């Protein structure tokens, strides 16, 4: 007999699953869904195991199969990213960042990064992990007209301040950053360049976004669950030498992790193979959809930023909603209509707590099979809420609309036949 308190919690989980999977338009730019096959194999015995150390050199016994899967995952990521070294043990993008900072920035050193209002992630800032590591920060200049790093101004700052590490990439990321140009400057002052690819990893793997390592970055850090639609986790990929890579390995373990949440390896590997097969089509559709949504919002009288530049070249759309009460108010109103976005600071904001913007990502709804026509419908739903229509009225239409898009695309299904094929090939059904 299952205790009542467990049933109550399970009821909450089931309500959440129905709401987010079948009834809402999910536009959080940092989320996605796995394929049915990846989800099934996300549950495995690895989830209760430890494998401290590195492949072939563990501090625990019973890890021979963990080594096989981790080695396969490392090999595939290295091939796809063109990296000499890959570490998949970080459990998140932030942990990947912290380990890299710790390994490459000396005590008392500094990094140059974008402020949060210009797209920098909290882990790039002096209110996040850099503060905990006592690493000083230098602000990279921002070119508001081009919605990107100001290369000329950055050259002056970098040559003057001479940071040990320059961080590109971010959490509000509409256009590729000038990696080649910044890498050239960094080389002249002896600094490393790290590209935080968390938001665009799937676009990189899909071939629609520049590969940072090929553009001159020394290190890629990333999560594995945004435009790359795998389980939550992190990775580090570099083209550095053995000494630097060894320092990164030591920073991952024992400094920042002990357990690597091993169960995610299998689902991450499945997702990586899916992206090799279907990733270009998926990533291309994601970028098309983001641009289509931005254009449709503009036609509805809403104000996406960077119109002169074509709004976006990633999965994201940033919208100035200051005339509707700001990002905090608008995000809450849209949630009442079952449209899920997040408030987000824009470059001209003074507060990240009460920002003027919202951030939208189309990668999950694209994963459910939506295209440009559906983006136009979503823009209409958003505009109805912003014009003052009762969110409950819009919500009814959103739920009805979403019923047509509940099957995950661009990945492997998990029918009985597929599962039997997998196990039969492993001689486990005999």
UniProtKB/Swiss-Prot annotation:
Places the protein is found: Cytoplasm
Gene: glyA
Pathway: Amino-acid biosynthesis; glycine biosynthesis; glycine from L-serine: step 1/1
Classification via Pfam families: SHMT (PF00464)
Modified residues (N6-(pyridoxal phosphate)lysine): 226
One GO cellular component term noted in the UniProt record for this chain: cytoplasm
General function of this protein: Catalyzes the reversible interconversion of serine and glycine with a modified folate serving as the one-carbon carrier. Also exhibits a pteridine-independent aldolase activity toward beta-hydroxyamino acids, producing glycine and aldehydes, via a retro-aldol mechanism.
A biological process term (GO) from this entry: glycine biosynthetic process from serine
Record-level Gene Ontology MF annotations: glycine hydroxymethyltransferase activity; pyridoxal phosphate binding
Domain of life: Archaea
Protein name per Swiss-Prot or TrEMBL: Serine hydroxymethyltransferase
Keyword list, A-Z: Amino-acid biosynthesis, Cytoplasm, One-carbon metabolism, Pyridoxal phosphate, Transferase
